[in-house]
Amino acid sequence: MNTIDTVVPEMNPALSESIVFAPIRTGEEGEKIPIIPINAALSESIVFSPIPPPPSTTDNTTNTTTTTIETTATDNTNDTEEKQENIENNNNNNNSSISSPNSIDGANKKDSIELEEDKEHSIKRKDGSLGDVVDNEKIIPNSLDSDAPEETSNLNKKSEINIKQVLKNPSFDATNDNHNPQEVDNTDNPDKPTTPRQTTTTTTTTTTTTSTNSTSNKLPNNGDNTVSFDEKFDPNVSHSNLNDDYKASGSSDSPNRVRLNTSQRLKMYKQKSEKRLSHRPKSIKLEHKKNVLGEIIYKGHPSWALMLNIQTGIRNAVGKSMGTEGGVNAKTPQQYHTLRKPSEFKRKEDFYVSPKTQRFESAGTAMTNAHSTGAFKFKDYCPNAFRYLRYLFGIDTADFMVSLCNTLKNGENALRELPTPGKSGSLFFFSHDMKFIIKTIPKDEAKLLRDILPSYLEHIQSNPNSLLPRFFGLYRVKPHSGRQVRFVIMGNLFPTKKKIHERYDLKGSVVGREASVDEKKSDSVTFKDIDFRNRKQKIFLGPGKKQSFIDQIKRDCKLLQSLNIMDYSLLIGIHYPHRENEPPSPSLLRSTLEDSSDFESPSMEQSSAGQQQQQRGSGNYDNSGAGRDSTTGGAAPKENDEIYISAFQQDEGGIKSQGGDTEEHYFLGIIDILMLYSLRKKVEHTYKTLKFGAKQEISSVSPDEYSERFQEFLSTIIE
């Protein structure tokens, strides 16, 4: 049934008695034509206007007073046209079809045809007949997530909405406003009874409003919550919640907002996801290492700038051997580009020469790359000699740089610092893979290392099973506003993933050579000579390896004795396989470093790239030259140059026990070899002799006496 509206004329009261008003009729295209059975001459003086809202009435069933006002597209004023356009734009932007009252004219027929086309379009999308359909996408005609084509031709649709609401909020979105959630369309659920909304018929002397079909006031959105707009507008009630509901629905303030298709929505979602993930810390898979210790040098750490300067200098110094034509390192002297032997130099001193100090500007120079820290100076001592030592020890140049100089901007792969653990006040930096140690040393120790370097290199060449520490480089860094720091790079004595259950620092002396009570309570305690004797157990190497060990100790001690060096010690780490499942201790080697002014280690990982496992004692070495440094383009050592792995580091950097009651895994090496028998040590010897007696075994003795006592003690604890 059609909705009948009545209009009230504004005219001369004197003529009102002669005029009879009749209901208007609906013409084509929804145009309303008033029927006035009076003199046509009077029609020009009549102006039709909408009737005022009737007084509210209360219904016992729904407690709702509704007034249905049909919006029409008339040409009376420009304001009416703008209102109608805003309403139609809202309907089109939300891709929803708002039904008109039932009518016998062609308006409802056109609406029903358009609804049928929408259903057919949705079926085609579900069947995959349209090219822009995404798999498993749910097609909802009235949903904002649907990318169904918009209906742009529905300019003459009738909309049952509250005009006052539209005037209050011109961008009001009919499909997104759920201020009346009680109105639910149960077309998708036929089992659930549908409760028709009670309508109210109000009759006055001049107005008749009828609503007979409740379904015409609902929005057809396929089972979703519908919205009714026949709620009466009360000027005394605030309607600010309409704006709140509208904003909460996620709609734009503009009625002509741009709709996104499926590909655009997926791209936008991907960008938002990447933005969220960029603020999250990256997930780092850390390999469990039981011998990890020290503090990671994070960005902002006091040693952060020092670490970056050290890494920048090492990359430039060690990278010279990897220089290529046209690169920065290609401009350095040719003698640093290739691996060379001492015999290739006419003068022996030229092999141990050090280049000039290089200045690193922040912006970079022709010889250096740009860096993030301030300007600093860097000195590389004896690069030819240390590079040749790295070759003999089987250390690949690329692996060496990756272990030490692979810190990222976010702090990943940074060095680990063990600050000032010993009496010397030195700092220790461990590489992120725990292969190498960077130790700061004083000037006199750096000078001693340069002085003994020729004898040390010759000893390593002739003694592949040497237990002496393995040095890989000596450098000096001087920040622009700071003091210069000298540091040496060595191998870690405990590179294994196995837990070191016990540690012993043995010198062969007795005075002051016992761990304190407080130290013994710590899991990282390093025991000393008296503790080892009280252990009443020996190191079981087997008869053959025992003799090899004693012979090698004699040769090493002979070298140190000739260099006037004393106060060194044998560091022993013991791993018990039957205690494999015990939790790792919080900080390993800390007590060892506290007892030692130097922490050098002869160990290295057997699996280093470019490494050849060759052993002179067993005769199973390979002199094919396959182990030469493949990172250089220049000459390499001849085929008779042999790369050796110590016989006491064949089993993951250590040696397994042979005999004894329990299975044990030993890690052995001599440490603290950069200590001369200087005037200070002589004064210490005199003082302790007077205090404890001449017959007492004290540490500060002459190099000859120290070497003899050291060898004698070790021969008694090895089986």
UniProtKB/Swiss-Prot annotation:
Q: Using the UniProt record, name the top-level EC class of this enzyme in a single word.
A: transferase
Which EC numbers characterise this protein's activity in its record? 2.7.1.-
PTM section of the record: Phosphorylated at Thr-262 by pkgB.
Q: Which residues form the PIPK domain?
A: 316-718
- Where composition is biased (Polar residues), the residues are 172-184, 218-228, 248-261
Q: Which residues carry this modification: Phosphothreonine?
A: T262
Q: Does the keyword rRNA processing apply?
A: no
Q: Does the keyword section mention Aminoacyl-tRNA synthetase?
A: no
Please give the Pfam families that the UniProt record associates with this protein: PIP5K
> Could you provide one GO biological process annotation from this protein's UniProt record?
phosphatidylinositol phosphate biosynthetic process
Cellular component terms (Gene Ontology): plasma membrane
- Residues of the region (Disordered) are 47-261, 579-638
This protein's UniProt keywords: ATP-binding, Kinase, Nucleotide-binding, Phosphoprotein, Transferase
Instruction: Please list the GO terms describing molecular function.
Output: 1-phosphatidylinositol-4-phosphate 5-kinase activity; ATP binding; phosphatidylinositol kinase activity; protein kinase regulator activity
Compositional bias (Basic and acidic residues) spans? Answer: 107-129
Function, as annotated: May be involved in signaling events that underlie chemotaxis via the chemoattractant-mediated pkgB phosphorylation.
Q: What is this protein called?
A: Probable phosphatidylinositol phosphate kinase DDB_G0267588
Classification from the root reads: Eukaryota, Amoebozoa, Evosea, Eumycetozoa, Dictyostelia
